[in-house]
Amino acid sequence: MAGNLFVVAAPSGAGKTTLVRMLLEQESSVNLSISYTTRHPRPGEQNGREYHFVETPEFRAMIARQEFLEWAEVHGNFYGTSKKWIADQLAAGRDVLLEIDWQGAQQVRALFPQAIGVFILPPSMEELTRRLTGRGTDSPDVIDRRLAAAQAEMRHVGEFDYVIINDQLAQALDDLRAVVRASGLSFGAQRARHAALFERMI
């Protein structure tokens, strides 16, 4: 695998989507994998940009055709990652970032043990509650379910290589960029990127 595969997970409301968007604006070498989902688009979202929005029967057909690297049901909706797209990007030496949940991260790392796991934590449950409430898109019942799910998800933080606490957005972004840049300087990444140099020098 020539490119690095980053798996970024977080409970809903931890700021993962914002952090990933800002990272992609500053690190042009990282390519975002756009997941398929049966969730309805939120205001401002576009098909093919935030997600590939599909109906549940189509998603189930894609599962049957084994087109997903990973897939999971989260909050009553399905999410999945295209297996072929990921493999093609990595083979071409491109870094890929997956923005998925912990269940998907487990599936990905079973197939790609060298994938780099990053978990985003909120600074407190109180702040997480404030962020979810402030969205104004979910009912109180949905928010309660998301908070309960968040607590369950955060129990899996030990399965990841890096943990970033998103208290101050700028600092969290610096931390995420540091993970990406350091991973690009690992022996395996440098050897794949500069194979001819390593053959001559070592």
Swiss-Prot record:
Name of encoding gene: gmk
Subcellular location as annotated: Cytoplasm
Keyword Acetylation in annotation: no
Entry GO CC: cytosol
Chain positions recorded as ATP binding sites: 10-17
Keywords, comma-separated and alphabetical: ATP-binding, Cytoplasm, Kinase, Nucleotide-binding, Transferase
NCBIfam families, sorted: guanyl_kin
Catalytic activity: GMP + ATP = GDP + ADP
Family: Belongs to the guanylate kinase family.
Enzyme type, top EC level: transferase
Phylogenetic lineage: Bacteria, Pseudomonadati, Pseudomonadota, Betaproteobacteria, Rhodocyclales
EC number(s) on file: 2.7.4.8
The protein, known as: Guanylate kinase
Name of a matching Pfam family: Guanylate_kin
Protein task: Essential for recycling GMP and indirectly, cGMP.
PANTHER family given in the database record: GUANYLATE KINASE, GUANYLATE KINASE-RELATED
